[in-house]
Amino acid sequence: IDVCSAGELACALRAGICGAQLLMHGNNKSMDDLEAALSAGVGYIVLDSFEEIARLGFLAERDGVRPRVLIRVTLGVEAHTHEFIATAHEDQKFGFSLATGDAAEAIRRVLALQDRLELAGLHSHIGSQIFVSSGFEVAAARIVGLLADVRDEHGVELPLLNLGGGLGIKYVSADEPPDVAQMAEVLREIVARQCANLGLAI
């Protein structure tokens, strides 16, 4: 379950959800947010900025913990949704750009702190209210390519790939939401094919 602040985290915990089942998101996490995530033992912290990597590394060393983290990657894809809720184009505030090399640099920085941070995998989110699979298909292919780059440069095969949510719902009567199982199967096939082509284990 995703939470995006210390407040949302507190609500989730109050509702009886175990910290290990939570992912801490947010592109502007405060020190309080990160400290709350560490204290709750959240399953994963999704990193969105270089400053956040440094902050979390400091807190992890101070507290003697080694949280599992994901790098949020901006993949530069067209999500075919309203521009206000598209989150994977280059000119936006979330994550590290694949095209500029920021994603690769973020991975290097986290791996340099591997005594404090456990890099578990990569995360992407291309937008909300998405009704066609093409954006997800491009995103899946690109992020699997980055997994292969990590293996080739660092000798590490990251175990987790999170392609995010954002599937459209019937918000107005004219909307025709996609079939979730069908879209999941399309993505599974793309990831499996890309992994096979690049020699990555699934």
Language-model segments: residues:
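N-terminal active-site wall of soluble small-molecule enzyme domains
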Residues: I1-V42
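Active-site-proximal loop/turn and secondary-structure-junction residues that shape catalytic pockets
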Residues: G7-E8, N28-S30, S49-E51, V73-V77, ...
